[in-house]
Structures are given as structure tokens and as C-alpha cells.
């Protein structure tokens, strides 16, 4: 099996294993993170109602000032932006869902930026 295919299968197994254990509510939504080679996305999800409360990514208009969207600086920008959106909706605590990705690099940078901006997790 090709190395990239094996890495994807491993990530999906990790994702399913973790997703069984965490649930977001309206008071404490799930902060879901997804990264691709060029972009990073974050969502606040209420699993009990099945709705997305807030979302942002490097594709949003506030990220147009970034020269490159697939690096740690872009992840920090998205982390601060999602924390700001959460504050607007009076959300202070979240459950962090790294979506099967390792807690390293861009995922860690987004989480740290969200914590510095006031989100508790």
C-alpha cells in the first residue's frame, strides 16, 4: 500500500476513535479543525442540534492579507478569528476536535492561538 494511502487510513481510524468520545453542545461546542495542503478550516459545531454555530478558514475575506495560506501564520490567524466569533456568540469553552490530525504544527498553532484569544479547552 502506498505511504500516503496508509497515512490517510490511519488518520481516519484515529478520527473515528476520537469522535466516539467527544460531543459538542450549545454551551460547549466542538471546535472541529481540518487542514489541507493549502488551507485550514475551523468550525464550532453543536452536535445535539446538528448545526454549525460559527466557521472560518483561510478562504474567508479576513485572510486575504496573508501571502500564503498553508503555513503556521495562517493557522494562528484562523485560531484568533474563530475565538473572536465564539466570543460574539458568548461561547467561552469548547471541546477541541483535531479530526484525526496529529497535535503538531498548524493544528497546535491554531489551538494555541484560540487559547490565547480566550477560548477554554
UniProtKB/Swiss-Prot annotation:
GO terms of biological process kind: translation
Keyword entries, A-Z: Ribonucleoprotein, Ribosomal protein, RNA-binding, rRNA-binding
Keyword set includes rRNA-binding: yes
A GO MF label: 5S rRNA binding
Gene3D superfamilies, per the entry: 3.30.420.100
InterPro entries (UniProt xref): Ribosomal_uL18_bac-type (IPR004389), Ribosomal_uL18_bac/euk (IPR005484)
An example Gene Ontology CC term for this record: cytosolic large ribosomal subunit
Keyword match Ribonucleoprotein: yes
PANTHER family (UniProt xref): 39S RIBOSOMAL PROTEIN L18, MITOCHONDRIAL (PTHR12899), LARGE RIBOSOMAL SUBUNIT PROTEIN UL18M (PTHR12899:SF3)
Function: This is one of the proteins that bind and probably mediate the attachment of the 5S RNA into the large ribosomal subunit, where it forms part of the central protuberance.
Family statement: Belongs to the universal ribosomal protein uL18 family.
Subunit organization: Part of the 50S ribosomal subunit; part of the 5S rRNA/L5/L18/L25 subcomplex. Contacts the 5S and 23S rRNAs.
Protein name as annotated: Large ribosomal subunit protein uL18
Amino acid at each position: 500500500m502506498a505511504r500516503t494511502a496508509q497515512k490517510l487510513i490511519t488518520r481516519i481510524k484515529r478520527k473515528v476513535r476520537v469522535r466516539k468520545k467527544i460531543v459538542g453542545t450549545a454551551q460547549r461546542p466542538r471546535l472541529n479543525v481540518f487542514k489541507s495542503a493549502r488551507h485550514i478550516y475551523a468550525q464550532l459545531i453543536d452536535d445535539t442540534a446538528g448545526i454549525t454555530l460559527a466557521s472560518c478558514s483561510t478562504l474567508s475575506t479576513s485572510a486575504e492579507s496573508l501571502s500564503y495560506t498553508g503555513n503556521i501564520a495562517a493557522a494562528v490567524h484562523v485560531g484568533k478569528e474563530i475565538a473572536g466569533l465564539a466570543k460574539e456568540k458568548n461561547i467561552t469553552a469548547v471541546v477541541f476536535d483535531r479530526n484525526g490530525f496529529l497535535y503538531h504544527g498548524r493544528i497546535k498553532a491554531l489551538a494555541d492561538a484560540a487559547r490565547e484569544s480566550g477560548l477554554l479547552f
